[in-house]
């Protein structure tokens, strides 16, 4: 995992999208967010040839969502 870019913003999903605890194609899916859901992210990461945004969940766990 690269160190990521400390960048923040909000992103609205255009399709049902997996949420993972690590930014990896092979990481298990923790749950799904639906099209139209908005993510307030605080980090961007490039891993496995993909771009991921990341946020800290209400439970304190860092989550990753692939955005490309």
Q: What is the predicted role of each segment?
A:
Residues 30-68:
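SH3/SH3-like beta-barrel superfamily modules
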Residues 1-21, 32-35, 43-45:
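SH3-family beta-barrel domains
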Residues 23-28:
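Short alpha-helix capping/helix-loop boundary micro-motifs
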């Amino acid at each position: 995992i690269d160190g990521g870019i400390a960048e923040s913003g909000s992103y609205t999903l255009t399709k049902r999208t997996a949420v993972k605890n690590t930014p990896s194609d092979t990481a298990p899916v923790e749950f799904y967010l639906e099209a139209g859901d908005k993510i307030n992210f605080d980090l961007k990461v490039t891993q496995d040839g993909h771009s991921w945004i990341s946020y800290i969940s209400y439970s304190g766990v860092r989550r990753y969502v692939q955005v490309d």
